[in-house]
Amino acid sequence: ASGGTPTRVTTNSAKEVPYAFSNDGSTIYFGATIADPAQSALFPKGSMEELYAVPAKGGRYEQVLATPAQFISFSEDGKTFLYQDRKGGENEWRKHHTSSITRDIWLYDTATGKHTQQTQWEGENRNPHFAKDGKSFYYLSEQGGTFNVWQMPIGKASEAKQVTSFKTHPVRFLSAAD
């Protein structure tokens, strides 16, 4: 495809990181540090961005979550999305990191506002993507020694299964396509 003319859809000078389109393509979800709510316990910091949505044709953006929610993946019906959290400023390239700020995968229900932690392993878990069945998801984890692709049924961390088994070089930046 030849593409089209680029159109600016946001006007804030903050760093913005695109994460996903809505399933119908009408909305872009992105992370940025624009406006932490006054009641937020997080210190405003460029690496601890909030989640925003903006119409794909441009317009006013709105804050979806005040907490860092990165690399989101919507369920087919668009009622829930998976995301990786960010609890602190650890270097994302550090290998074999286990601490209280390692990333976990969460499920967010857009109707109720409920966040449900999906991964329970103490190390890094990243880049969630809903599986076609809608009942499980794929993600990256260092649980097997280096980053590999794992699959887990929603809400069943004990049933997580390693899909790839690379030993020398980790899998980075998992993506999915139809």
PLM-predicted stretches and their roles:
Residues 1, 9-17, 22, 26-52, ...:
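A flexible loop/linker signature enriched in serine peptidases of the S9 family
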Residues 21, 74, 130, 175-176:
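Residue-level recognition of a conserved intra-blade site in WD40 beta-propeller repeats
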Residues 24-26, 77-79, 133-135:
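Short coil/turn segments that connect the beta-strands within blades of beta-propeller domains
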Residues 57, 77, 131-133, 143, ...:
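Structural motif
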